[in-house]
C-alpha cells in the first residue's frame, strides 16, 4: 500500500508531560508554535552559536557555520521539504499539518551536542563509560525534557510529537552498544577516537521520558519501533535502530543535506578542498548517478562552485539543495512482506529517490574525507577532546569544591537519592560552549 487511508492522529501527540498553568493572555498560538518559541528563546539554543559544527569558533576565517547556523539551515530545508511534499503528495497533508512542528524539531536536533563537536562527544563518552555513556542525540532529548530551566523538572516541556520527532534512535545505549568494550587507556592522550565513538540512543537515566513519548503506541508498534537495522558485524560494532517517525525522517534528510552541501560550501570558501579533488571524488560520480538532471548539469554546477564568485557559488549550492529536496517522497517504512505499523506517524517516512540518495552519500563522503578527517581539523578536535576529559577528571575529583552552586546541589541530590551523580557532571560540561570550556580549562590548569 503506497497511499494512506483517511489519516487520523491521536490528540495525545499534542500532550505535554506536565500540565501547565501559564499566564498568557489571549494566546492563540498552536501547541507547536509554542514549542518553537521555547526552543528559540532557550539558553541551550543560544549556546549553539559558540559550538563547533565543522570549523570551530575562533577560526581564522569567520565565514564558517556554527551549530546554530547549521540548525537554522536544517530548519529551512526541513520546512521546504514539508512544503513540496504537501504539493506533490496532497493525500499526506493531514500528516504534515504544521510548519512550526518541523521548525521545532530541526532547530532542536543538535541542542545536546557538547563543546568541540565529535571530539567532545568521544571525550564525554569515555569519561562516562562506567556510568551510562554519553551521546549527542540522547543529550538532546535530556535537555529538552529535563534540563533546560523553562520548567522546574520537565525541561522545555515540549509536546509529545515534537519529542518523537527528535527521537532518532528509540533504544537505550546499552541495548545497541557493541558486545565487547574497547580497552581503557592509562593516559587519556593515547585515547583513539575510533575506539570510543558512542552508540546512538537514549540514556537509561531517561527511561521515564522515552516511555512517556511512546505511550500512545500499541505494544506491537513499540516492539517494531525498537528493532535494529542489521546484526552486528563484529563484537566491536554498535547496532542502530531501524525506524523513526515521519517527522524525524524529514529532519534527518534535511540534516544530511545541510551537512553534505552547506558544509561543503564552507570548505570551498576556506580553500580546504580543490577543484581537482571535487572532480575526482564527486563530479565524476554524480555524472553517472542515474539522475538525468544531475548528469546533465553537474559540469555547470562544478564551474559555479569553483568560479571564485560568491553569487555563482551560491547559485551552485542552491541548485544542489533544490535537486535533493525535490527528489523526496513519502513511502511506507516497511516492505511488502513485513508487518505494518499501526500508527500513521510511524507507517510512513520520507525518502530520497535511489539515484539522489546515492548522490547525497557521495557528497557526505567527500565532506567526511576531505573536511572532517582533514589533519588540521582532527588536531583541533583532538585538542578539544583532551580539554573535555581533563575538565571532567578535575570536576569529578572534588565536585563539591569545583562545581557551580546549582550543579553542586543537583550532584548532592543525585548522590543522596542513589541516582547517577556522574550524569550531573556530564550535563554541566555538555552545556558548555567551546570558549567557556577553554576558559574553565585555563582556570583549572594554566599557572597564574
From Swiss-Prot:
GO terms for biological process: dGTP catabolic process. It comes from the Bacteria. Keywords: Hydrolase. Residues 67-260 form the HD domain. It holds the Pfam family HD. One of its GO terms (molecular function) is dGTPase activity. Gene3D superfamilies: Hypothetical protein af1432 (1.10.3210.10). Belongs to the dGTPase family. Type 2 subfamily. This is Deoxyguanosinetriphosphate triphosphohydrolase-like protein.
Amino acid at each position: 500500500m503506497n497511499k494512506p487511508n483517511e489519516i487520523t492522529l491521536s490528540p495525545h501527540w499534542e500532550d505535554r508531560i506536565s500540565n501547565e498553568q501559564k499566564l498568557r493572555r489571549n494566546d492563540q498560538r498552536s501547541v507547536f508554535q509554542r514549542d518553537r518559541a521555547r526552543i528559540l528563546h532557550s539558553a541551550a539554543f543560544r549556546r549553539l552559536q559558540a559550538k563547533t559544527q565543522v570549523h570551530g569558533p575562533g577560526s581564522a576565517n569567520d565565514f564558517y557555520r556554527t551549530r546554530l547556523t547549521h540548525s537554522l539551515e536544517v530548519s529551512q530545508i526541513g520546512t521546504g521539504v514539508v512544503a513540496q511534499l504537501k504539493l506533490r503528495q496532497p493525500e499526506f497533508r493531514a500528516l504534515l499539518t504544521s510548519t512550526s512542528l518541523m521548525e521545532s524539531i530541526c532547530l532542536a536536533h543538535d541542542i545536546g551536542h557538547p563543546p568541540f563537536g565529535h571530539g567532545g562527544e568521544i571525550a564525554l563518552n569515555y569519561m562516562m563509560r562506567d556510568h551510562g555513556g554519553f551521546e549527542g542525540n540522547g543529550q538532546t532529548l535530556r535537555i529538552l525534557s529535563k534540563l533546560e530551566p523553562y520548567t522546574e523538572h520537565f525541561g522545555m516541556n515540549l509536546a509529545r510529537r515534537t519529542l518523537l520527532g527528535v527521537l532518532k534512535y528509540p533504544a537505550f545505549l546499552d541495548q545497541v552498544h557493541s558486545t565487547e568494550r574497547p580497552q581503557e587507556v592509562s593516559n587519556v592522550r593515547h585515547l583513539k577516537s575510533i575506539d570510543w565513538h558512542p552508540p546512538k540512543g537514549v540514556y537509561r537515566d531517561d527511561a521515564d521520558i522515552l516511555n512517556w513519548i511512546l505511550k500512545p503506541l500499541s505494544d506491537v508498534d513499540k516492539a517494531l519501533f525498537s528493532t535494529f537495522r542489521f546484526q552486528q558485524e563484529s563484537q566491536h560494532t554498535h547496532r542502530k535502530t531501524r525506524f523513526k517517525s515521519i517527522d524525524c525522517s524529514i529532519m534527518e534528510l534535511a540534516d544530511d543535506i545541510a551537512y553534505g552541501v552547506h558544509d561543503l560550501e564552507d570548505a570551498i570558501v576556506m580553500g580546504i578542498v580543490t577543484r581537482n579533488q571535487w572532480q575526482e571524488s564527486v563530479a565524476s560520480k554524480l555524472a553517472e548517478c542515474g539522475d538525468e538532471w544531475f548528469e546533465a548539469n553537474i559540469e555547470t554546477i562544478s564551474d559555479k562552485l569553483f568560479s571564485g564568485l560568491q553569487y555563482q557559488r551560491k547559485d551552485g549550492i542552491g541548485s544542489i539543495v533544490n535537486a535533493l529536496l525535490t527528489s523526496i517522497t513519502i513511502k511506507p517504512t516497511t516492505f511488502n512482506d513485513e508487518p505494518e505499523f499501526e500508527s500513521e506517524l510511524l507507517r510512513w517516512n520520507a525518502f530520497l529517490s535511489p539515484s539522489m540518495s546515492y548522490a547525497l552519500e557521495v557528497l557526505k563522503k567527500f565532506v567526511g574525507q576531505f573536511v572532517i578527517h582533514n589533519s588540521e581539523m582532527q588536531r583541533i578536535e583532538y585538542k578539544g577532546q583532551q580539554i573535555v576529559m581533563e575538565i571532567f577528571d578535575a570536576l569529578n575529583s572534588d565536585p563539591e569544591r569545583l562545581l557551580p552552586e546549582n550543579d553542586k546541589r543537583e550532584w548532592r541530590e543525585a548522590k543522596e537519592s542513589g541516582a547517577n551523580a556522574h550524569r550531573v557532571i556530564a550535563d554541566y560540561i555538555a552545556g558548555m560552549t567551546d570558549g567557556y570550556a577553554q576558559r574553565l580549562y585555563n582556570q583549572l590548569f594554566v599557572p597564574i
